[in-house]
């Protein structure tokens, strides 16, 4: 069974919800495969995720990992899916006990050392997330003031992958 989290995509200034699904396929060669009409930044996310995860001591899956960005017929551009993909993978492999992971929208590029880098288009993505009915969002700390301009959605500004894990596990995030 796959783990699903959500992010947002932009077409111009209009946003739409993206479902990020992570599944491991046992018995196949170790690799991360990302599908769903992503650009080069999306395709490179696997390398950033692996580096960020190992910085915090998480294990890479021993089998093939498939990450799907849906809807599959709409283009996904940018590196802001990294955080959602990493959290979906950690939850799928039962390395974190994420509570309510499916209720959040995740936006953020991961650095190789696990920091969450700022992104462009956060205001439009949070606006679209609220319009889609989402109540919780995680964005890079540097984008928090921009994201908080949108009412009706609770937004957390985080600095690292580990802070996101703590939030999802119900541990205090300072």
Functional labels for PLM-detected ranges:
Residues 1-174:
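Peripheral, non-AAA+ core regions of ATP-driven protein-machinery
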């Amino acid at each position: 069974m796959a783990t699903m989290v959500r992010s947002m995509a932009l077409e111009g200034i209009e946003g739409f919800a993206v479902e990020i699904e992570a599944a491991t396929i046992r018995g196949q060669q170790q690799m991360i495969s990302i599908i769903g009409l992503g650009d080069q930044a999306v395709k490179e996310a696997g390398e950033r995720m692996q580096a960020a995860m190992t910085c915090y001591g998480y294990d890479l899956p021993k089998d093939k990992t498939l990450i799907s960005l849906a809807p599959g017929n709409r283009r996904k551009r940018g590196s802001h899916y990294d955080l959602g993909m990493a959290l979906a993978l950690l939850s799928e492999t039962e390395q974190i006990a994420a509570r309510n992971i499916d209720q959040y929208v995740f936006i953020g590029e991961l650095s190789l050392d696990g920091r969450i880098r700022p992104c462009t288009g956060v205001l439009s993505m949070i606006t679209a997330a609220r319009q889609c009915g989402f109540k919780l969002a995680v964005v890079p700390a540097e984008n928090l003031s921009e994201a908080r301009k949108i009412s009706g959605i609770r937004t957390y500004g985080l600095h690292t992958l580990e802070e996101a894990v703590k939030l999802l596990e119900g541990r205090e995030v300072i």
